Each structure stands twice: as structure tokens, then as C-alpha cells.
């Protein structure tokens, strides 16, 4: 380890006893935060420790080889269950579900809105959501009702968490809330279209009457919370949008601005799958896995939010 308390990719691979390709895969998925120094990627010691702690607690399948595509099927021709969503809680759910249904679920790492559209098109069985609707002040239900037209569904809470802004340590630009993002001296790092964080930002800018074109950095995109936090930590942006849990691993300060509801939706026609998911979410084992993670609140975990 060097004097800055960080590791090269080769060193991380050696410590984890995996290949460099596996380490790059973890970084790409946002499971392991990293940043660039010149042409070299580095991983902070504390981030590596946190990753190893999360692995011991949950052993999520996200840390294994890249997931198979949705088109793949088991030998008997029956397709695997597909879970779409980027949060580690979905990796933990996948592991529990594998034991419950004796089948390895496939994982798709897509944003909330894009995943919901995939479900409508028959490409996903379980979709995680954190989509804020400014008109109603609600999370998820308004979007699910609009998009899953004619499809009876069950919307169930997974966790409650804080969403807001990542800022550099010490908050040198004195960023306090959404309105500060229109300042000319503030550069943000944005999220991809269809992600819950992008929807949250766009809804908040709309409430303030701010034109996205006036926000410096609005067109700069990353595809997960950890990458957003890493961009802020490295000084490439002054603020990023995301959930609290990534701030700890991304070595940034966090400004909480809204209580976020992270839910999953399952179509009711998948009766056995829905039954298994409800049992897992209400189990003490699953809640215990989540309670060990930074910034996760489980008081509503397993509660049915809406069903049609």
C-alpha cells in the first residue's frame, strides 16, 4: 500500500484473490468505488474494507462473474427469474431467492424507470424503484400505475433511505440544497436518463423553475451512485445526486434532502415468485442483512405499499 492509503487494481486483485478483470467488473457495477490518478485506477483502503465487510454480511452475487443475459434459459427451456436494479439490497434479495426457489436469478443493473419499462415489455420479473413524483410528493406508485397499465401488480417496500447531494469534504462551496445547483460556480455530475437519481433531480429543478441547460455539468453522466460520489471526491464535480450509503464509500460529505422510498414491484400473475419475495422481505434474516448497511432503514421493509 502506498502513502496515500490506496491500492492499485493489481494490489486489489491480489488481496481479494481474484483477477484484475473481476476488479474492473466490480468497479464498473459500482460495487467497489475507485478513482483515477493520471492513467491509473486506485481504490482507497477504507472503500476496500467496506466492500469486504459488505461481502461478509450479504455475499451478494454482484461480486461474482457478470450476470447472464435475460434471453438465456435453463436446460429445460424455462427462463431464469430476472431482477433489475442497481442497489446492493437486490443482490442480497437474489441470494435469498436462490435458496427459496432453487434457481439462480439473473441480475440486470438498470435504473428505475428503464427497469419498469422493461417489466412492461416482459423482460423483468422483479424491479426495484426509487422514482419521485413532484406532483403528488410520492415515490414509485404514480409511475407504476401509469406504466404497468392493465397489469395487476404488487408494490412492496425494501428500505427507506436518505437521498440528496454528495459534496466534497468540508463542503467548500457551501452547497445547501437543490437551488444551489443553478449557481455558475457549481459543477454537478448527473445520472443517466431513467435512473431514480436523475428523475429526482429533474423533478426538483422543475419545482424550482430551473432550466436544466442552466445547470453546469448537467450533461456529464455516470451510471451509479458510487461513480457520482467518486467524481465529487476526486474534484471533477462539486456536487452529485444520490443516496446516503454511497457517500461513506465515496469519501464525500452528504447533504440529505429527501426521505427516499426504495420499493420493488412484482406482477401478481407470478404468484409463486411473489409469495417467495414477500416471505424473504419479511424475514428477520433479510432485514438483518440490510440493517448492517450504512443509511438503510428497515421499519417498512416487507410492507405492501400498493397492489392492484
Curated annotation (Swiss-Prot):
One of its GO terms (molecular function) is DNA binding. Gene3D superfamilies: Periplasmic binding protein-like II (3.40.190.10). PANTHER family: BLL2305 PROTEIN. This is Uncharacterized protein YvgK. The gene is yvgK.
